[in-house]
């Protein structure tokens, strides 16, 4: 409706609307009525808090309104009146209520607390619950903050392809894209699937990262970023992994690993601070009902410098500590979540950059250090989550990059265009990837990745 006011606007600019007629539209959260008057808590999704509507038997459809089930949609015209002695700061005294849509009486989200596991089974309705309406508003605000940060820094927003013929991570855990008949694909003389007959004429997959394409643009525009969906065919049924998730991937030219870490820290602090400023009600809800120490932790992150250690130093700390881990610690292993959380939660008690990882556990494009054992890579670890950002200085030396690819059995012809970047004005450059869902988990205190993405895609689950 043209003259409808958002509930958020009424809360944020109350003085503008007090004692004036307003029109709102939304869904009934609660309704209680007697023979002569009633109260409706209505929410339109724009704000965490509801607004109370008072109606009486002067309305021509009073009896019909009094019997409306929860989640019915209505439009209300009435006067906004201050209520200084009540629980809510104001209410709308209704002059007219229009029923937009009736809800069935078997609506699953009745007024009681539901488990997150149950709410995942009704993902099409869970945005209407308090926890998930708060989560997805925070997600929206955080996404905007990311764009705002990079645009203010002069970065160029770049769209990288979702369908790709390259494996950025070299891990092979990719979803295949094909139009070949799965029951009877055409075969080569050797009996292998003939991908030259496929739609793209070669093997193609859903992207695991936009980084390689992003480097092309960084070496033209200097500072760029991508923000889009990525896909991993990892059969990991954990609270931290999903098959489809969103990644933020900046690339900066004329930059080394130190520049990369400074950018990551500045971006993370900016986004968290922005969400704290824009979503105080949501974060207070999470602090009260999800994670009691959330606000204290977020304030600490924004106000303190991040720690930094090398991988070798981190391993030494873990080997010397008294804590028993499920996974043994030794130089050369990929740090597990329990190791990362010990470092951030018990030893440093703050976010931590770990740098200079063994080359064997990192990707081919990361710049080789002088020791020929480690690469100029970093992971940012945060309390409660573990790794949230992975980045590196990229290998700009063509001969070193080709040697590393040969060592890993990667075919140069599959990456010919990526290698050509090193022939035409190569320069040092760096970048990182931030898993957006893990960031939202950190900001909200939610502990399962399935609860911070609207319709999660995990092993065995593609519903909705």
Curated annotation (Swiss-Prot):
UniProt keyword Protein biosynthesis, yes or no: yes
Gene Ontology CC, one term: cytoplasm
EC number: 6.1.1.22
Chief site of localization: cytoplasm
Keywords (A to Z) from UniProt: Aminoacyl-tRNA synthetase, ATP-binding, Cytoplasm, Ligase, Nucleotide-binding, Protein biosynthesis
GO biological process annotation, one example: asparaginyl-tRNA aminoacylation
Enzymatic reactions: tRNA(Asn) + L-asparagine + ATP = L-asparaginyl-tRNA(Asn) + AMP + diphosphate + H(+)
GO terms for MF: asparagine-tRNA ligase activity; ATP binding; catalytic activity, acting on a protein; nucleic acid binding; transferase activity
Keyword presence, Cell inner membrane: no
Protein name: Asparagine--tRNA ligase
Species the sequence originates in: Clostridium botulinum (strain Eklund 17B / Type B)
Gene name of the encoded protein: asnS
């Amino acid at each position: 409706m043209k003259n409808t006011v958002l509930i958020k606007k009424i809360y944020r600019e109350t003085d503008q609307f007090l004692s004036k007629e307003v029109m709102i539209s939304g869904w009934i959260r609660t309704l209680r009525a007697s023979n002569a008057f009633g109260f409706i808590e209505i929410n339109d999704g724009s704000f965490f808090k509801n607004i109370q509507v008072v109606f009486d038997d002067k309305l021509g459809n009073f009896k019909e309104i009094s019997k409306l089930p929860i989640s019915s949609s209505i439009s209300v015209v009435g006067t906004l009146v201050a209520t200084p002695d009540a629980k809510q700061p104001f209410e709308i005294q209704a002059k007219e209520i229009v029923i937009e849509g009736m809800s069935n009486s078997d609506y699953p989200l009745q007024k009681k607390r539901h488990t997150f596991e149950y709410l995942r089974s009704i993902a099409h309705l869970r945005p209407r619950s308090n926890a998930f309406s708060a989560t997805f508003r925070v997600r929206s605000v955080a996404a905007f903050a990311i764009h705002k940060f990079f645009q203010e820094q002069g970065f160029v927003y770049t769209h990288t392809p979702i369908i790709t013929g390259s494996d950025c991570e070299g891990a092979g855990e990719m979803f295949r894209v094909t139009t070949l008949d799965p029951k009877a694909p055409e075969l080569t003389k050797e009996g292998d699937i003939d991908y030259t007959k496929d739609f793209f004429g070669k093997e193609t997959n859903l992207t695991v990262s936009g980084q390689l394409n992003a480097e092309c643009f960084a070496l033209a525009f200097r500072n760029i970023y991508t923000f889009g969906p990525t896909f991993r065919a990892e059969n990991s049924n954990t609270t931290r992994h999903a098959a489809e998730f969103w990644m933020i991937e900046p690339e900066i030219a004329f930059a080394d690993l130190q520049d990369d870490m400074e950018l990551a820290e500045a971006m993370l602090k900016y986004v968290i601070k922005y969400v704290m400023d824009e979503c105080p009600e949501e974060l207070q809800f999470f602090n009260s009902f999800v994670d009691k120490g959330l606000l204290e932790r977020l304030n600490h992150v924004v106000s303190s410098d991040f720690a930094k250690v090398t991988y070798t130093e981190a391993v030494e700390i873990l080997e010397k500590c008294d804590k028993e881990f499920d996974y043994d610690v030794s130089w050369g292993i990929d740090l597990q979540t329990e190791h990362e959380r010990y470092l951030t939660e018990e030893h440093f008690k703050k976010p931590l950059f770990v740098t200079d990882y063994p080359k064997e556990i990192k990707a081919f494009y990361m710049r080789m250090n002088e020791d020929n054992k480690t690469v100029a890579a970093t992971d940012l670890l945060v309390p409660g989550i573990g790794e949230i950002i992975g980045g590196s200085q990229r290998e700009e030396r063509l001969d070193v990059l080709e040697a590393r690819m040969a060592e890993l059995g990667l075919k140069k012809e599959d990456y010919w265009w990526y290698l050509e970047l090193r022939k035409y004005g190569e320069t040092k450059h760096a970048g990182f990837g931030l898993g957006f869902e893990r960031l939202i988990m950190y900001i909200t205190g939610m502990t399962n990745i399935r609860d911070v993405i609207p319709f999660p895609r995990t092993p065995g689950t593609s519903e909705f």
